Amino acid sequence: MAKRRVDQMLVDRGLVESRTRAQALIMAGLVHTPDRRIDKAGEQIAEDTPLTLKGQDHPWVSRGGIKLVHGLEHFGLSPAGLTCLDVGASTGGFTDVLLHEGAAKVYAVDVGHGQLAWKLRSNTEQVVVLEKCNARALDTAIIPDPIQALVCDASFIGLRTVLPAGLELCVPGAWAIALIKPQFEAGRDAVGAKGVVRDPAVHDAVCQMIHEWWSGLPGWTVLGIDPSPITGPEGNREFLIAARRDG
């Protein structure tokens, strides 16, 4: 496995905005691998090593916001003035970014409860909190507004299962960005220890499968797939897929 400088890896994964910031965090003792603290910015480690920050280095209520910011920039999409649906809202990292980027309204859907950050939960003018809500059962009785943008960062369930109902609520011209998580899409035999999928061939196969599925939905066009700037839990690689509804 090739090795790379830790400070550059932090930048490339979107955990920090610059090598200078990365070096400052390393000197402060805030950068860790799963088994130790990184002490030198110039240290070279295996390029697939999971890295975490013990202090927050982004403005969002969760690090998930980093992923959506990258997706919006990469695919050239904007939620400004739109009514949006956040599937698998959890703490609200994606909802936070949508509002920051000018979304008019966000329906924050999650099967759990009590997770959404207070600053979002208390924004009753723009955020509709739908807790204990099964995204597979969404309809116009639950969400009466036409959805113009959909985002999804769901866990323990595949996109082909969790997205169809929400996508049906999207109007022509709407766009969507979702995270492909191979550990929840691949077969059990492809998932290794601690639920980690390390084989690039499995990553490619899963991304191709989701691309073909979404492309086959009436009226939808896939805009592309791009690696997430940061890894998921335990170092799992994740991928952002974007699509637009044409009709």
Residue spans for each PLM region:
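Conserved SAM-binding loop of SAM-dependent methyltransferases across substrates and taxa
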Residues: T91-A103
